C-alpha cells in the first residue's frame, strides 16, 4: 500500500449567491450551515485539518465565534476550486511561518462543498482512498465520487452523469444521459457492465500539484459547452479517478431545501 499522504479538507463558503444569498449562514437547527458541514468533515479520520475558506467578514466572524478554523481569501475567484487552491496556499504559508515544511506537491486537498450539511464523513474516506491504492495510488492526481442512478434521474440535465474506463478513470462527464442506448429504451445495469447510469457526486480530492495545474488552465471548450469545470481537467489530459459510493447526501440550493436537511439530520442522528 502506498504511504498515506497528508490530507486537508477545505470548505469554500461564499456569501453571495443569486438563489440563496448568505447561504453559509442559513440557520439549521440553531447553527449556521457551515458549522454542520465542518462538524461532519472533521469526523473523517483521514483529514489532518479542516478549514473554512471565505471572503466575507460576516462568515469569518461567525466561524471565529464557533471555533471553526478559517482562512480569508480574495473575493474575485471565478470558482470554488480557485478559492480552495488559495486556501491551500495560505495553509502552506502558515505551516512555513511556524517553522514547519509547507504543503508538499503530493499532499491531498479535499474540496468539501459548503452547502452539504448532511454530508456523511465516510464519503470523504472513500474519496481519499484511491491515493493509497496498492496498484496505482501514486499516479492518482484527482478523485471524485459517483453513484448508481435510475433512468428518470439520468434524464435530468441538472444531474451530471459520468462514464468510466475499466481502471475507474472518468472518460466523460455530461448533462446528457450517457451512455446512450442505441437500441432504444433504457438498458438495465448488469454485474459485468455495472449500473446503467452513474450520477456524479460533486466532491473532489486533488494532489496539490493537480489543483495548481487546474487553476492555471484556461476554461476549455467542452467545459464552456456543458458548464462543467471538471471537463477542463479531462481535456488537458489530467485523469480523474471515479470512486463508487452508496452514501447519499442532499445539497442546499434554495431556502426551501432547509426543511429537507433538518429532516435528514434528524434521521441520521436517530
Curated annotation (Swiss-Prot):
Chief localization: cytoplasm
InterPro entries named in the record:
Cytidylyl_trans (IPR003329), KdsB (IPR004528), Nucleotide-diphossugar_trans (IPR029044)
Specify the pathway.
Answer: Nucleotide-sugar biosynthesis; CMP-3-deoxy-D-manno-octulosonate biosynthesis; CMP-3-deoxy-D-manno-octulosonate from 3-deoxy-D-manno-octulosonate and CTP: step 1/1; Bacterial outer membrane biogenesis; lipopolysaccharide biosynthesis
Q: Which UniProt keywords apply?
A: Cytoplasm, Lipopolysaccharide biosynthesis, Nucleotidyltransferase, Transferase
According to the UniProt record, one GO cellular component term is: cytosol
Its UniProt entry gives the catalysed reaction(s) as: 3-deoxy-alpha-D-manno-oct-2-ulosonate + CTP = CMP-3-deoxy-beta-D-manno-octulosonate + diphosphate
Entry EC number(s): 2.7.7.38
Q: What is one Gene Ontology biological process annotated in the Swiss-Prot or TrEMBL record? A: lipopolysaccharide biosynthetic process
Named from the GO MF annotations, one term is: 3-deoxy-manno-octulosonate cytidylyltransferase activity
Compartments (UniProt record)? Cytoplasm
Q: What class of enzyme is it?
A: transferase
**Homology family:** Belongs to the KdsB family.
Job of this protein: Activates KDO (a required 8-carbon sugar) for incorporation into bacterial lipopolysaccharide in Gram-negative bacteria.
Stored PANTHER family: 3-DEOXY-MANNO-OCTULOSONATE CYTIDYLYLTRANSFERASE, 3-DEOXY-MANNO-OCTULOSONATE CYTIDYLYLTRANSFERASE, MITOCHONDRIAL
Please state what the protein is called. 3-deoxy-manno-octulosonate cytidylyltransferase
Q: Which organism is it from?
A: Nitratidesulfovibrio vulgaris (strain DSM 19637 / Miyazaki F)
Gene responsible for this protein: kdsB
Amino acid at each position: 500500500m502506498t504511504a498515506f499522504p497528508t490530507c486537508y479538507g477545505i470548505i469554500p463558503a461564499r456569501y453571495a449567491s443569486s438563489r440563496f444569498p448568505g447561504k453559509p449562514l442559513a440557520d439549521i437547527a440553531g447553527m449556521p450551515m457551515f458549522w454542520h458541514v465542518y462538524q461532519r468533515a472533521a469526523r473523517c479520520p483521514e483529514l489532518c485539518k479542516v478549514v473554512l475558506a471565505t471572503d466575507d467578514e460576516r462568515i469569518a466572524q461567525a466561524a471565529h465565534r464557533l471555533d471553526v478554523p478559517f482562512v480569508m481569501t480574495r473575493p474575485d475567484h471565478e470558482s470554488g476550486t480557485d478559492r480552495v487552491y488559495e486556501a491551500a496556499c495560505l495553509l502552506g504559508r502558515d505551516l512555513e511561518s511556524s517553522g514547519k515544511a509547507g504543503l508538499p506537491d503530493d499532499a491531498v486537498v479535499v474540496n468539501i462543498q459548503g452547502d452539504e450539511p448532511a454530508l456523511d464523513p465516510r464519503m470523504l474516506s472513500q474519496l481519499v482512498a484511491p491515493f493509497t491504492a496498492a496498484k496505482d495510488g501514486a499516479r492518482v492526481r484527482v478523485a471524485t465520487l459517483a453513484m448508481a442512478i435510475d433512468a428518470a434521474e439520468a434524464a435530468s440535465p441538472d444531474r451530471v452523469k459520468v462514464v468510466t474506463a475499466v481502471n475507474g478513470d472518468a472518460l466523460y462527464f455530461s448533462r446528457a444521459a450517457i451512455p446512450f442506448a442505441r437500441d432504444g429504451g433504457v438498458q438495465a445495469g448488469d454485474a459485468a457492465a455495472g449500473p446503467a447510469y452513474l450520477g456524479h457526486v460533486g466532491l473532489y480530492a486533488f494532489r496539490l500539484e493537480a489543483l495548481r495545474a487546474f487553476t492555471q488552465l484556461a476554461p476549455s471548450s467542452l467545459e464552456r459547452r456543458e458548464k462543467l469545470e471538471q471537463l477542463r481537467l479531462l481535456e488537458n489530459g489530467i485523469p480523474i479517478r471515479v470512486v463508487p459510493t452508496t452514501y447519499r447526501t442532499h445539497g442546499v440550493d434554495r431556502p426551501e431545501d432547509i426543511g429537507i436537511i433538518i429532516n435528514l439530520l434528524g434521521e441520521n442522528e436517530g
